[in-house]
Amino acid sequence: MRTVGIGAGVRRLGRAVVMAAAVGGLVLGSAGASNAAGVMTGAKFTQIQFGMTRQQVLDIAGAENCETGGSFGDSIHCRGHAAGDYYAYATFGFTSAAADAKVDSKSQEKLLAPSAPTLTLAKFNQVTVGMTRAQVLATVGQGSCTTWSEYYPAYPSTAGVTLSLSCFDVDGYSSTGFYRGSAHLWFTDGVLQGKRQWDLV
């Protein structure tokens, strides 16, 4: 979560795959299987705000389903519901490894569903680097996307904020299986830096 721009989006995608298998997406039946009563949910993810402390995050998320990770031990990874062979998950990054550090990044996989996905390949192709977030959403459909990751590198300043959206076609999203028609869009300071799509028609 500590990179920016189009390269950041590609690296985040790779990290998400690793995280799904290694932390947030522990294989079903493993010793680290989640306690279903307290798993991370979309509501909990939304409730956890930038600027919260590590303890505040754990109080909301449920410490029994979370663990610390990251190169400097400054991230918290929390498991959600079962999603095929893996788990949905959320990751929260902090301004430092200190106990009183503040949340400066959030990411999630399969916790937030698009409200009304209508993305198509034609709409995706109309999206160009340099568009604002508002312009992109007006093109792909306001209900097609959810926030995959958001990072404030100079928190509490909003300068340099990076945002990644996951967007879907009408049948693309699945909370428990593989995504089908979908796209990732990466922004820095509200301006599109790059895009990628899978199986859109």
UniProtKB/Swiss-Prot annotation:
Sequence repeat ranges, renumbered to this chain: 37-112, 116-201
Protein location: Secreted
Transmembrane region(s): none
Principal cellular location given in the protein's record: secreted
Signal peptide per UniProt: 1-36
Gene3D superfamilies noted in UniProt: 3.30.1450.10
GO biological process: one example: regulation of beta-lactamase activity
Alphabetical UniProt keywords: Disulfide bond, Repeat, Secreted, Signal
GO cellular component, one term: extracellular region
UniProt-listed InterPro entries: BamE-like, Beta-lactamas_inhib, BLIP_dom_sf
Result when mutating W186A: Decreases binding affinity for E.coli beta-lactamase TEM-1
Highest taxon listed in the record's lineage: Bacteria
Subunit details: Interacts with E.coli beta-lactamase TEM-1; interaction inhibits hydrolysis of beta-lactam antibiotics. Interacts with K.pneumoniae beta-lactamase SHV-1. Interacts with K.pneumoniae beta-lactamases KPC-2 and KPC-3; interaction inhibits hydrolysis of beta-lactam antibiotics. Interacts with E.coli beta-lactamases CTX-M-14 and CTX-M-15; interaction inhibits hydrolysis of beta-lactam antibiotics.
Record's function text: Inhibits a wide variety of beta lactamases.
Protein name as it appears in the record: Beta-lactamase inhibitory protein
Gene source species: Streptomyces clavuligerus
